A protein has these predicted regions:
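Preferential activation on post-signal-peptide N-terminal prodomains/segments
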Residues: 1-136, 262-266
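Conserved histidines in hydrophobic membrane contexts and catalytic metal-binding motifs
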Residues: 67, 146, 227-233, 252
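A general secondary-structure signal for short beta-strands and their flanking turns/coil
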Residues: 103-105, 139-141, 222-226, 240
Length: 267
């Protein structure tokens, strides 16, 4: 069981400007990126053949240990590693043209976990049938992003929404054929409540994971095992589907994502 806390975004950053920290001739700016962000921002594939050596004096395993020591110090419990990569320092000039790229350090992303399994970080702010609502809501994600180089941690950002209490309990879930039988009933009913513009929806991904649900009392929540049926136009960005339905893995009922998000966001 989880109780809502006062969500506060926190950060640990270098006081020194990155260009002063890592100066380079002909460069005006420098920005550190994870591999995914580097590819997204530059439109360039990262080193696929691992021919570029990471200049960090720590191995990736040593760096991860230091990242997890930091998480322990800030009281981050029940988290799991979601992603890790080399750290790319992209140097640009005054015209925003790339001057150079150095690979030095690592980027780690952790998220809330249940029994050491990361919970879903899938967002519904691009889901077509939920964009018609009057107010903007989305499911908050407890994410911890840490970057480090040979000098240690240089940047960290995180936000806590929930405080865990008690022990997790086992849940009996439906077999997948049983779930599909229930889904044939519950998904059409869901789309009557939140209609979409399509005559038919072809989901292209199905995932068994944990998802946040509302508890019995105000401010009380729990992570349940669920099946997420989703359709994603951009398969390189699966956390932002265009259609998405969350089914309770125990009984096949649809979890109202918007209702849960509103309750988490309530003062």
């Amino acid at each position: 069981m989880y109780y809502k806390t006062d969500s506060v975004y926190r950060s640990f950053n270098m006081r020194e400007d990155f260009m002063m920290y890592r100066p380079k001739e002909k460069a005006t700016y420098v920005t550190p990126y994870s591999k995914a962000d580097y590819e997204r921002e530059t439109g360039t594939e990262a080193d696929q053949e691992n021919t570029v050596q990471n200049a960090c004096s720590y191995s990736k395993e040593e760096a991860q240990m230091k990242a997890e020591e930091f998480l322990s110090k800030i009281g981050a419990k029940d988290v799991a590693l979601q992603d890790s990569s080399d750290l790319y320092w992209v140097y640009t000039d005054a015209k925003n043209s790339v001057v150079a790229t150095d690979v030095d350090g690592y980027s780690f992303t952790y998220v809330r976990a249940v029994d050491k399994q990361p919970v879903s970080t899938m967002a519904f702010n691009r889901v077509e049938n939920l964009q018609k609502q009057v107010e903007y809501y989305d499911m908050p994600v407890e994410r911890y992003e840490i970057t480090m180089d040979s000098n240690g941690i240089i940047n960290a950002n995180w936000c806590d929404y929930l405080e865990a209490t008690g022990e997790s309990t086992k849940t009996e879930i439906l077999s997948f054929p049983e779930l599909l039988e229930k889904a044939n009933e519950t998904i059409p009913e869901y789309y009557k409540t939140y209609p979409c513009k399509y005559n038919a929806i072809n989901f292209n991904d199905v995932t068994l994971t944990y998802y946040l649900t509302a508890g019995a009392a105000d401010g009380q929540f729990e992570y349940k095992p669920v099946w997420i049926f989703s359709s994603c136009d951009d398969k390189s960005d699966p956390d932002y589907p265009s259609e998405m339905v969350v089914l309770d893995a125990a009984d096949g009922s649809v979890i109202d994502m918007l209702d849960v998000a509103m309750k988490v966001s309530a003062d």
